[in-house]
Regions:
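N-terminal Sec/SRP start-transfer signal
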Residues: 1-29, 196-207, 263-265, 269-272, ...
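Interfacial "coupling" helices/loops that link adjacent transmembrane helices in transporter permeases
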Residues: 5-16, 72-112, 189-196, 630-669
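Selective transmembrane-helix segments that form parts of the transport pathway or gating/packing helices
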Residues: 14-20, 106-124, 159, 163, ...
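Alpha-helical transmembrane segments
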Residues: 29-61, 135, 371-397, 610, ...
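Small-residue-rich transmembrane alpha-helices
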Residues: 29-40, 76-80, 113-142, 154-179, ...
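Conserved transmembrane alpha-helices of multi-pass membrane proteins
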Residues: 51-68, 140-168, 195-208, 234-248, ...
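Nucleotide-cofactor and metal-assisted catalytic machinery
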Residues: 391-611
Length: 740
């Protein structure tokens, strides 16, 4: 009997459950689609040199971890449905049904609809998974062909995940209904909330921000004491002063405002804190750029600490802006009587002000989450494009190995090897070789061998014949030099202004074999690999062969190009052999370390990690975006249910249906527009700062044009999602207030 009642109630209330069905179906679709490539039954055609098993485990962990956020969304949607049906539950309880039974029936309804949503979501996920497969094949450079596939293990994982989530949420709903009194269920929609000025949300945030300011002041003072130098350039001095002065002044205002809050008023007090927070953020976010430009010597924990301060400062700014925007709405309403009583403005202001306390908290959380989502959407193509672009520079040769002398402190211990293990492996496995080059790199002066100051290592030099051999391997034209000339080869990420400044200061090169002058054609920047550069340098000197014979060889390299790509298993065996024979970090001191790269395994590793990163960021951004827009929509639809009577009164007073729809549009415009606008503004600032900090890498590895195309696509997707949610909410809101 109960099963029939559950089915009948679900069928009768399908309109009420529509938002629940759509949300759950969308969540299941995304979950199945992104998780499908981790299935043990997933075997795309990508060639013998690739192996996707590297990304299956990481993909499963990343997607399942991010999907825990869906537990909150499922909980919120269930609570929305619970509130929506409170009157119905009260009537059933009044007629004699036990509240425990009511709770179980509600759980049965939601569980039945969950199974329906999961079924539809898996079918849609099979279609969407083709998009994920196309992304994966594009990452490996393989063509995409549609193939309908079904993965039983992914289906079981999807069903299990959402069933467990629904059971956890459903048990909570049953407990809530058991503890609720009938009168509470009957009158829940009539309860008023506290006015905005009595909300404790913002005062608590101010207290936490005051504690943060004290911490920032302490850190800024310590860094000033240990790192400040009067010889620093003016921008660095301003940064040090700002990291002490602005937190101190803001903290002083916070203390004074707390003491004199009755005279000042909370809104003025918060305006002062907001101004201080903006000023405090300026020197904090300048640290990374100044560290990059002037090598200030801040260690990673210090930079991470200031990053934490910057993020916390932004969160406070968002909270303050949302609160002050709502306070400004109330002030604007009361500032002029004619404005308040113009047409239906009084009703609109009443609608907005009645939920300011709750909505301020919700809008703040949504704004922060939405900002994070937008940042993830934009940062995803930057990070993944950077990673793939860097791969083109790192894994240039099929096999490459280079020694490093930075841990060798005696010239006698410098390695002198031709890497014979590679030769033996090639012969043993019958690998066809296209090009094979072994060469050394030198220090211009032997005294430079003992120079080990970080960021001040000397550039290496390469003989002209070896440099031209490298260029030939990569398909570049050879270069020529006079016997008394030298040229330079620069890292792909080096900026033009840095190259020009360096060349202007280094027109002569002092070597142990004499002085060389700069060639007329002295700058080359084609990608030739990462290993030819010394630590913390972006340039290599190209010198005549006769000069190189006199200099001290400190780095030994071997680059091999094969006729055909190495199979993955063969490449893995070679990588393990090189790791044993030429360790990156030798156990003994005063021995050289080695950097080895096998193209096949490196490409597999980087593409796998890159795809996991890209998929995780996009999936996380979509989940957060859906959560924010769903919460916004549900909040307004819940208000529509509560305020149905108010709109019916306006209708009876003669207000036309067109004007009522305009009121709805204005109300939705405020509650949708406020957090979204704030999130977009903050995201633009954060993303602008991030793009500026990695501008050199973007130019070198991605290209501004390609990045703008990707960002444009992302903006279009975000705008489409927003429009769909806004229009859907508007239509459902109008339908809700028109029912009676």
């Amino acid at each position: 009997m109960y099963a029939k009642l559950i089915f009948k109630n679900a069928k009768r209330s399908v309109k009420d459950y529509l938002i629940y069905i759509v949300t759950m179906t969308l969540c299941v679709t995304l979950f199945y689609a992104f998780l499908s490539i981790s299935s043990t039954h997933y075997h795309p055609t990508i060639g013998a040199e690739y192996n996707i098993s590297l990304l299956a485990g990481g993909m499963k962990l990343a997607i399942c971890g991010i999907s825990l956020l869906l537990l909150f969304l499922i909980h919120y949607v269930n609570r929305f449905m619970l509130r929506k049906k409170q009157k119905e539950f009260a009537v059933e309880a009044t007629l004699g049904m036990e509240q425990k039974t009511i709770g179980l029936l509600f759980f049965g309804e939601t569980f039945f609809l969950l199974i329906f949503s999961v079924s539809v979501g898996i079918l849609l996920g099979m279609v969407v998974s083709q998009v994920i497969t196309a992304m994966l094949l594009a990452s490996f450079g393989e063509p995409y062909a549609f193939s309908w596939s079904f993965f039983p293990d992914t289906v079981l994982l999807t069903v299990g995940f959402f069933v467990v989530c629904q059971i956890l949420v459903g048990v909570g709903n049953v407990r809530i209904l058991n503890k609720s009194r009938i009168i509470e269920l009957m009158t829940a929609n009539r309860q008023n909330e506290k006015p905005l000025h009595k909300s404790r949300w913002m005062p608590m945030i101010c207290i936490f921000y005051g504690i943060l300011l004290l911490w920032m002041l302490e850190v800024g003072t310590v860094k000033y004491h240990f790192y400040f130098d009067s010889r620093h350039p003016l921008p660095v001095k301003l940064m040090y002063w700002g990291n002490v002065l602005f937190p101190a002044l803001t903290l002083l205002w916070a203390i004074a405002g707390a003491v004199l809050h009755r005279k000042i008023g909370f809104s003025r007090y918060l305006c002062g804190l907001l101004a201080g927070a903006v000023l405090t953020a300026i020197p904090i976010f300048s640290i990374a750029e100044l560290e990059k430009a002037y090598f200030l010597g801040f260690d990673a924990p210090t930079l991470n600490q200031y990053l934490l301060f910057g993020v916390a400062d932004i969160l406070f700014i968002i909270s303050a802006v949302i609160y002050l925007s709502n306070a400004a709405l109330l002030y604007w309403k009361e500032s002029k009587v004619s404005r308040k009583y113009h047409n239906t403005s009084l009703f609109l202001f009443g609608q907005l002000s009645s939920k300011l306390a709750t909505n301020t908290k919700t809008m703040t959380i949504i704004c922060v989450t939405l900002t994070f989502s937008i940042c993830l959407f934009v940062i995803a193509p930057v990070l993944t494009g950077w990673s793939l672009g860097y791969l083109d520079s790192r894994a240039v040769y099929d096999i490459q190995i280079s020694s490093r002398y930075n841990d060798v402190y005696e010239v006698e211990n410098l390695p002198d090897t031709d890497y014979g293990e590679i030769t033996a492996f090639i012969e043993q496995n019958n690998i066809a070789i296209k090009e094979d080059l072994t060469f050394s790199e030198y220090l211009p002066q032997k005294s430079d061998f003992y120079q080990r100051v970080k960021y001040d290592f000397p550039p290496l030099a390469i003989a002209l014949k070896d440099y031209n051999a490298v260029r030939k391997m990569l398909g570049y034209e050879p270069i020529t030099l006079q016997t008394d000339e030298f040229a330079t080869h620069w890292h792909r990420a080096a900026e033009d202004k840095d190259i020009e400044n360096y060349i202007a200061k280094h027109t002569l090169l002092e070597t142990d074999a004499g002085t060389l002058k700069l060639s007329e054609n002295a700058v080359f920047q084609e990608p030739v690999g990462e290993s030819i550069y010394n630590l913390y340098t972006d340039v290599v000197y190209i010198i005549p062969d006769e000069i190189a014979q006199v200099l001290l060889p400190v780095q030994s390299n071997r680059f091999v190009m094969t006729q055909y790509p190495l199979p993955f298993k063969t490449a893995e065996m070679l990588e393990q052999l090189l790791g044993r024979s030429y360790p990156e970090d030798p156990d003994k001191d005063n021995l050289a370390g080695y950097s080895t790269t096998v193209h096949t395994t490196e490409v597999n590793r980087i593409i796998a990690l890159n795809f996991i990163l890209k998929a995780s960021l996009i999936y996380g951004a979509i989940v957060l975006m859906v959560m924010c827009l769903t919460v916004l929509a549900l909040q307004q639809l819940l208000d529509a249910e509560k305020n149905n009577y108010r709109f019916s009164v306006l209708r009876k007073m003669g207000v036309e249906e067109k004007d009522l729809h305009t009121l709805v549009l204005k109300q939705l415009g405020v509650w949708f527009g406020m957090p979204i606008t704030a999130a977009i503004v903050v995201a633009i600032i954060v993303i602008g700062y991030f793009l500026q900090s990695v501008s050199a890498e973007i130019s070198a590895y991605i290209g501004c044009g390609a990045l703008m195309v990707q960002v444009g696509i992302i903006i279009g997707i975000l705008f489409l999602l927003l429009i769909c949610y806004f229009i859907s909410t508007w239509i459902l809101f109008k339908r809700s207030i028109s029912e009676n």
